[in-house]
């Protein structure tokens, strides 16, 4: 098929999530209102570290992907697909990283649509992910572990383990 793997990163992904229940927090240090030190802030958006943040982000991106015509597979969460004119597009969501493969024209269009809704960084073709190096050729893709620095410069002794 010759499908390439593309990678995008959603900047400040959790801040895109909307908190559906009432959540309050103390005023942040440095932003305390004089004479109202005991007041708290009601959150409208998710913050990093908030236990509801991953769920709020996932709900937000899931809704948007559905609006774009994606369907989530029943076999695996965070794996989406869509087919337009017999041209497939597959999207994998991993926290704040998106991976796309399929028809190149559809990938380009999808990247534009995602960037309109979320602040994104297009990382282009995937080269690294979760400690794996990804090599992509015209009709093949290889995964391999990334050697640590000692392995690369030949200083690691097998007996050190």
Regions found by a protein language model. Give the residues of each.
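Long, low-complexity, charge-biased intrinsically disordered regions
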Residues: 1-161
